Amino acid sequence: MEQLKQLLTAAGIAYKENEPLAAHCTFKIGGPARLFVQPVDRAQLCRAVALCKAQGVRYYLLGNGSNILFADEGYNGAVLDISSMQDAVEVHGTQLTAGAGVRLSALCKTALEHGLTGLEFAYGIPGTVGGAVYMNAGAYGGEMKDVLTTVQYLTAEGEIKEATAAELDLRYRHSIFEENGGCILSAQFALIPGEPEAIRTKMDELMAKRLDKQPLDKPSAGSTFKRPVGAFAAALIDQCGLRGYRHGGAAVSEKHCGFVVNLGGATCADVLALCEEVRAIVKEKTGYDLEKEIRVVR
């Protein structure tokens, strides 16, 4: 690790030691990262990945920190903070190209400014472009795969490659990047011309729905369980009388049973124990076996 620190410094790449990960995720849970690396552009990100590989240091790519749960003991390796990158959105006709570190909200606003429709569903999803593509994020009837055309990524071997959306095995909360270890660098989206006022109205309606239905006033990782075939996780959890059910500082949200929230001082252990208890009760009472949507990073 000392050698890696020296190499990062020589390359002009900023980093912090023992940085609390709770400060960098929407759940507000997690111990320290041994190294918290903050590349400012694609070149620094690629260099940081190469240095980690060369030094045999495990690494994790972090976007906006939604949909993840960091371990209480933290991460014994290097967390690469993509959200620190000075990425931008480029507009070419009806095509948008965005760096992995761009916030989804910024991407949606750019589409609105240029009168392009297709991304309204993503407005309010608390994540970056890279994270959204990685998990094929979606809401209110839309998914990233509906508008994604190509992705540029860094392979596990250190090569920069491009792939079409059809090559990414995009399905419900999944992409090929979960298996191939690739690092998303940028993504291109194909939209269609629309009326700015209609686009704005749709975005405002969906945001209002989020504020009304979701517990955005409390720390969480977003939707906690994947939607089982033929049912809805939140409805099953509510049906089992688990609204407000808690373990330590973690609880099933009173507002939306599909969310586990941090009531204050929750630990990773609290959340995992709660999820397992909820899963077991739902399985016993309904026959459905819920699968976590949030990713646990140890």
What are these regions (language model features)?
Residues 105, 135-137, 166-172:
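Short acidic (Asp/Glu) patches
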Residues 34-35, 67-69, 78, 105, ...:
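Short, electropositive, low-hydrophobicity segments enriched in small/polar residues
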Residues 16-17, 68, 154-276, 280-298:
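Phosphate/pyrophosphate- and phosphate-bearing ligand-binding catalytic cores of soluble enzymes
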Residues 55, 62-64, 147, 218-219, ...:
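Short, basic and Ser/Thr-rich N-terminal targeting/leader segments
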Residues 30, 37-42, 69-87, 134-165, ...:
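Structural signature of FAD isoalloxazine-binding scaffolds in flavoprotein oxidoreductases
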Residues 22, 40-43, 102, 106, ...:
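Conserved active-site and cofactor/substrate-binding residues in soluble primary-metabolism enzymes
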